[in-house]
Amino acid sequence: MASTTTCTRFTDEYQLFEELGKGAFSVVRRCMKIPTGQEYAAKIINTKKLSARDHQKLEREARICRLLKHPNIVRLHDSISEEGFHYLVFDLVTGGELFEDIVAREYYSEADASHCIQQILESVNHCHLNGIVHRDLKPENLLLASKSKGAAVKLADFGLAIEVQGDQQAWFGFAGTPGYLSPEVLRKDPYGKPVDMWACGVILYILLVGYPPFWDEDQHRLYQQIKAGAYDFPSPEWDTVTPEAKDLINKMLTINPAKRITASEALKHPWICQRSTVASMMHRQETVDCLKKFNARRKLKGAILTTMLATRNFSAKSLLKKPDGVKKRKSSSSVQMMESTESSNTTIEDEDVKARKQEIIKVTEQLIEAINNGDFEAYTKICDPGLTAFEPEALGNLVEGMDFHRFYFENALSKSNKPIHTIILNPHVHLVGDDAACIAYIRLTQYMDGSGMPKTMQSEETRVWHRRDGKWQNVHFHRSGSPTVPIN
């Protein structure tokens, strides 16, 4: 009988030290590779607590991080799965957050801001060249390699990152941190790489004056500002900023993603590549002072969130009222944890699941509307050509393809001039990974019979949906109860 061997490679090769940070299902600890003495940061995920979707997200994060090798990105060195735990071994970044370092400097100018955003753009460009969209660019995820002067800026936390094909635009779910979300995400439009460039525009704006371009305690009003692109360059603080810097911000904060500047284009902008002659060298004390207040607000919100998480006395709605994004801090160590804690992930996950379920209900309603209207063309656009079905009209047989359904559309549904109204009751949606879902519901159909009397039919339906190229298609349904076509 063959025996199964449990992997113990992490336990054998690495020694664990103090905790650097903590999330819902993971902890980050300093570790050392025993054979070399090299220090790293280990993100330790308790896989026993993960759902199937969480497992998929973990695999995606590891796959993405393995792909990205750049001096301005926190590097994944190892990914090891052991019994009950998964270990992601990252660079040990000890310089803390970029924004915290800036406020500790004696001198900070527009040219320094240019150098910071250049490194961020280099990391984003590398991601985009490799078909990766980060989706959560914000100050908390911009770290410094060390405490040394001139240490490299490192982009961290790829927990929300996605893989895209070329310039593909699709709906990948509602993800990000409120103040850095792009208009297209808020509109629930298909999106892609340009969302990262919008976030870069928000970050650059903050780097120059110490406060964000979009701000409101009320989240709905904040989102309205973002969708309208309602920002400006108020006096007096913007009077000393060069026109070239403002031009780059305008190109990044362009509402239309198709017209928004790309990372490679931004790196060629004069304010970036001709910094020494274009960017101002004047010390910006007002920016430093404002940035201190901005950082303090973020830390306060982080402390409040930590308390809420500890007591579990929180709701998705309360978490969504944090436009800056927040971080949970568990360690007094100077070492920075390189994962976003539950600040954005809880918010996004709750919002993402809710939005995706609503999407399935909406597309199901569209399909039923096509049936009621006798619109076979609209029906075929929503259904897979190989659609399988169990329905009363088929007398218990499994039917495949469109021909069986075409008969009813052409000979009954399209020729009916009776008013029909359908209600979906108690819809239950099960999300199966990122690209599949199942919905079960009661369907009530109201119509007028041949004698002009109102009638109601009831059926119980289950539909299976699969997303291809960003579009949901019905691949299977099972209906019991009344048939589709109202009987006189």
Swiss-Prot record:
Activated by Ca(2+)/calmodulin. Binding of calmodulin results in conformational change that relieves intrasteric autoinhibition and allows autophosphorylation of Thr-287 which turns the kinase in a constitutively active form and confers to the kinase a Ca(2+)-independent activity. Residues 291-301 are annotated as: Calmodulin-binding. Its EC number is 2.7.11.17. The gene is CAMK2D. SMART domains: S_TKc. ATP binds at L20, G21, K22, G23, A24, F25, S26, V27, V28, K43. SUPFAM superfamilies: NTF2-like, Protein kinase-like (PK-like). Keywords: Acetylation, ATP-binding, Calmodulin-binding, Cell membrane, Kinase, Membrane, Nucleotide-binding, Phosphoprotein, Sarcoplasmic reticulum, Serine/threonine-protein kinase, Transferase. The CAMK2 protein kinases contain a unique C-terminal subunit association domain responsible for oligomerization. It is found in: Cell membrane, Sarcolemma; Sarcoplasmic reticulum membrane. Belongs to the protein kinase superfamily. CAMK Ser/Thr protein kinase family. CaMK subfamily. This is Calcium/calmodulin-dependent protein kinase type II subunit delta. The modification Phosphothreonine is found at T287, T306, T307, T341, T346, T347. CAMK2 is composed of 4 different chains: alpha (CAMK2A), beta (CAMK2B), gamma (CAMK2G), and delta (CAMK2D). The different isoforms assemble into homo- or heteromultimeric holoenzymes composed of 12 subunits with two hexameric rings stacked one on top of the other. Interacts with RRAD and CACNB2. Calcium/calmodulin-dependent protein kinase involved in the regulation of Ca(2+) homeostatis and excitation-contraction coupling (ECC) in heart by targeting ion channels, transporters and accessory proteins involved in Ca(2+) influx into the myocyte, Ca(2+) release from the sarcoplasmic reticulum (SR), SR Ca(2+) uptake and Na(+) and K(+) channel transport. Targets also transcription factors and signaling molecules to regulate heart function. In its activated form, is involved in the pathogenesis of dilated cardiomyopathy and heart failure. Residues 332-347 have a biased composition (Polar residues). It catalyses: L-seryl-[protein] + ATP = O-phospho-L-seryl-[protein] + ADP + H(+); L-threonyl-[protein] + ATP = O-phospho-L-threonyl-[protein] + ADP + H(+). CDD domains: STKc_CaMKII. The active site is at D136 (proton acceptor). It is a peripheral membrane protein.
